[in-house]
């Protein structure tokens, strides 16, 4: 009877501690610690209340990653669904979680054509949109002033040919919306790094990559306070991209830093992941990497199995390969 009681107690303790075992295992080989030892600022991931309140997912975040990006909770539809009526429950959760666990924060995102409430999309008056844009940026950034390392001020504003996307912001304000957004952001939090962020910036000779670099170079020459370019780096398998060369092209625009901001790779091969990590290590202005999620279970590309942990939160070969490479 005593032996059965002891066994039952052991099983109960083991079950209750499953998350902490994961945490202890990963803490011994933290990607963030290894990456920072190479001179970089962070190796991070994204999350929000749903994933961060999953104890197994959270244990890995706490042990392995040094930075957090809100996946959805800071986007316009979440923070200002109706004009002048702000909602910060989800964003507050992430910021408080990050502060409690010593994680840097990348704010994402202030100006984006997608996940944009209809009331914003319907604005046609230049003065009205300017006022709305300034108020939104000011209100969101002011709430988290001093707590956010970097902000994606504008997101996905380029077409694949390197021209500017025809969003409500461009249609009403023209290219000037970029200046308005960055100048407002700088005035609210002068210490935060201000980024422009986009996808398909993975080949140096691609029109979108060159268009981004050329526009940013011009905007900086005009005094627009752009500190960094974020390359989302959502990749297919097989390495038909030149991330290192692309990062160098982006860095040549005159920004003080670049970052890989939303990394995931279809199939999550060890070779592909190590190549991307080495690309950032090889570019002096590349300050960090953010993978777009912890586990395939919660990935927006779950069918592609693109992350470093499988659906059961077990580290993949790519995880171990990165640790070995670092």
UniProtKB/Swiss-Prot annotation:
According to its UniProt entry, one GO biological process term is: xylan catabolic process
Q: What is this protein called?
A: Probable endo-1,4-beta-xylanase C
Name the chemical reaction catalysed here.
Endohydrolysis of (1->4)-beta-D-xylosidic linkages in xylans
Where does the source fall among the domains of life? Eukaryota
| GO cellular component assignments | extracellular region
Which residues does the UniProt record annotate as the domain GH10?
46-325
Major localization listed first in the record, in broad terms: secreted
Query: What does the organism's lineage look like at the top?
Result: Eukaryota, Fungi, Dikarya, Ascomycota, Pezizomycotina
Role this protein plays: Endo-1,4-beta-xylanase involved in the hydrolysis of xylan, a major structural heterogeneous polysaccharide found in plant biomass representing the second most abundant polysaccharide in the biosphere, after cellulose.
Q: Which InterPro entries match?
A: GH10 (IPR044846), GH10_dom (IPR001000), Glycoside_hydrolase_SF (IPR017853)
Question: Gene3D superfamilies under this entry?
Answer: Glycosidases
**What protein family is recorded?**
Belongs to the glycosyl hydrolase 10 (cellulase F) family.
UniProt xrefs under PROSITE patterns: GH10_2
| Pfam families associated with the record | Glyco_hydro_10
């Amino acid at each position: 009877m005593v032996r059965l009681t002891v066994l039952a107690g052991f099983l109960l303790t083991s079950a209750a501690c499953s998350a902490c075992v994961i945490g202890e295992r990963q803490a011994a080989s933290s990607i963030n610690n290894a990456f920072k030892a190479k001179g970089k600022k962070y190796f991070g991931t994204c999350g929000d209340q749903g994933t961060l309140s999953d104890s197994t997912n959270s244990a890995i975040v706490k042990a392995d990653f040094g930075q957090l990006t809100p996946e959805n909770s800071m986007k316009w539809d979440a923070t200002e669904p109706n004009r002048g009526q702000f909602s910060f429950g989800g964003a507050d959760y992430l910021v408080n979680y990050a502060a409690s666990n010593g994680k840097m924060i990348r704010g994402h995102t202030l100006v984006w054509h997608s996940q944009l409430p209809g009331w914003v999309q319907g604005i046609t008056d230049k003065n009205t949109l300017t006022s709305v844009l300034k108020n939104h940026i000011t209100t969101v950034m002011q709430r988290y002033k001093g707590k956010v390392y970097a902000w994606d001020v504008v997101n996905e504003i380029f077409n694949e040919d390197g021209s500017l996307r025809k969003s409500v912001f461009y249609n009403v304000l023209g290219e000037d919306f970029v200046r308005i957004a960055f100048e407002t952001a700088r005035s609210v939090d002068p210490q935060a790094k201000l980024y422009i962020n986009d996808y398909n910036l993975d080949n140096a000779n691609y029109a979108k990559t060159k268009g981004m670099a050329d526009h940013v170079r011009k905007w900086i020459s005009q005094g627009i306070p752009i500190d960094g370019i974020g390359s989302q780096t959502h990749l297919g398998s097989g390495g038909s991209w030149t991330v290192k060369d692309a990062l160098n092209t982006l860095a040549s625009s005159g920004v003080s830093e670049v970052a890989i901001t939303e990394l995931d790779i279809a199939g999550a091969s060890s070779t592909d992941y190590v190549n991307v990590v080495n690309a950032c290590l090889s570019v002096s202005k590349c300050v960090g990497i953010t993978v777009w999620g912890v586990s395939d279970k919660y990935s927006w590309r779950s069918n592609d199995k693109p992350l470093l942990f499988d659906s059961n939160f077990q580290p993949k070969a790519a995880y171990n390969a990165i640790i070995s490479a670092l």
